[in-house]
Amino acid sequence: MFHLLAGLGNPGTQYTLTRHNAGFMVIDAILDKFHFPNFKKKNNALISIGNIESYRVILVKPWTFMNNSGVPIMNIVSLYKIPLDNMIVFHDEVEIDFCTIRVKKSGGNAGHNGLKSIDNFLGKDYWRVRFGIGHPRNKMDLSDYVLSHFHNLNAVNNTISSIVEHITLLLEKNHTTFTDKVRNTLKYEDIPD
């Protein structure tokens, strides 16, 4: 039985390494660490199928804009008959501290348009890993903030490395231990150089 790990983001080089693409960054790191094959386009998504230890895993990056993420993910879930309990979505979250992660199942979408889209097509009964991107310090418009680049990319990469290092705990549904392990990394701030 497959597990689906999906990362949310926007396609296009102008969005690479932006806060809103934190989910894509996690999926790319998993692909590299576990030597998955290169992504192939299928059903408006980039997918790669491989193994993480004994788990058969499909990595997914919806190749649509964030607001339309639900359709390609629904198509992959349907095609591979993936139970929603085996689906984990990685996404950016402005309501938690920079480079902090939280795992939850179901619940609200906190205004995240990618999650709203998934919820519309699949319901809410799936796992989410919320990647904290912090909240803008000044009066910057929220949409401009999430589409801006990280200042402290080293901290982002360290957090992503910790997520990838402990990803098997998520697949085992050991969410509390996963969160504790990733939390034990250093605290960071995303301050300009």
From Swiss-Prot:
The residues the record assigns to binding tRNA are Y15, F65, N67, N113
Q: Which reaction does it catalyse?
A: an N-acyl-L-alpha-aminoacyl-tRNA + H2O = an N-acyl-L-amino acid + a tRNA + H(+)
Q: Tell me if RNA-binding is a UniProt keyword of this record.
A: yes
Q: Which GO terms describe its molecular function?
A: peptidyl-tRNA hydrolase activity; tRNA binding
Q: What class of enzyme is it?
A: hydrolase
Record-marked site positions (Discriminates between blocked and unblocked aminoacyl-tRNA)? N10
Q: Share what the entry says about its subunit structure, partners included.
A: Monomer.
Protein name (record): Peptidyl-tRNA hydrolase
Write down the species. Answer: Ehrlichia canis (strain Jake)
